[in-house]
Swiss-Prot record:
Chief location of this protein within or outside the cell: plastid
Organism whose genome encodes this protein: Brachypodium pinnatum (Tor grass)
Protein name: NAD(P)H-quinone oxidoreductase subunit 5, chloroplastic
Catalytic activity, reaction form: a plastoquinone + NADH + (n+1) H(+)(in) = a plastoquinol + NAD(+) + n H(+)(out); a plastoquinone + NADPH + (n+1) H(+)(in) = a plastoquinol + NADP(+) + n H(+)(out)
Gene: ndhF
Subunit organization: NDH is composed of at least 16 different subunits, 5 of which are encoded in the nucleus.
Disulfide-linked positions: none
Length: 214
């Protein structure tokens, strides 16, 4: 005698996209450990039950359960490797040029006062730079201050991009931060109308990745 103990609970859930539109959560993740599509069988065994003398009945017990479909937030697709690799190459060149172009204190030469950089200090032999250590520390402090502000803005941009374009199984996707901005009456919000106009204008215009994915 076979019995299946399973229950499936599915609902029509919707999510609000970046532009305020309702999008059905259509990403399904089915956990299947056996040939059954909607059920997972844990074990099955034969149970021998004796009744009286010589009266034996074999029962096959099947224990199974079902994992419902997991609905996740629909998020924009990530940039492919065709865009990632050129950006990494440009990053290396930008980092190298920015490193060798850090300005340091002035040094008097035969042609006048020349603004030295790390590259010029590598190429020009130095005689004595110990007398200018105080000016060097001042310029280094200014450089570090500017670098901290620019790097902080870059990290903030990466954090925002990770929230919108990150993995569907990340911690921020479980918090559902995007829908929290549209609670209440989003259609009456001015920013909602602005984003809707921008989206209608930039659809198939502002995205360059579509040319690489085709």
């Amino acid at each position: 005698h076979f019995q299946n103990y399973s229950s499936t609970k599915e609902g029509s859930l919707y999510s609000i996209s970046l532009w305020g539109n309702r999008i059905p959560k259509g990403v399904n993740k089915d956990f299947v450990l056996s040939t059954t599509k909607s059920e997972v069988s844990f074990f099955s065994q034969n149970i021998s039950i004796s009744k009286g003398q010589g009266n034996t009945r074999n029962r096959t017990g099947s224990f199974s359960t079902s994992f419902g479909s997991k609905n996740v937030f629909t998020y924009p697709h990530e940039t492919g490797n065709t865009m990632l690799f050129p950006l990494l190459i440009l990053l290396l060149f930008t980092f190298f040029i920015g490193f060798i172009g850090i300005p340091f204190d002035n040094r008097t030469m035969d042609n006048g006062i020349v603004r030295l950089t790390i590259l010029s200090k590598w190429l020009i032999p130095s005689i004595n730079f110990t007398q200018e250590s105080s000016n060097f520390s001042i310029n280094s402090y200014e450089f570090i201050t500017n670098a901290i502000s620019s790097v902080s803005l870059a990290i903030l941009g990466l954090f925002i991009a990770y929230i919108f374009y990150g993995s569907a199984y990340s911690f921020f996707q479980n918090l559902d931060l995007q829908n929290s901005f549209y609670k209440g009456s989003p259609k009456k919000n001015f920013f909602y109308q602005v984003k809707k106009k921008i989206y209608s204008w930039s659809y198939n215009r502002g995205y360059i990745d579509i040319f690489y994915s085709x």
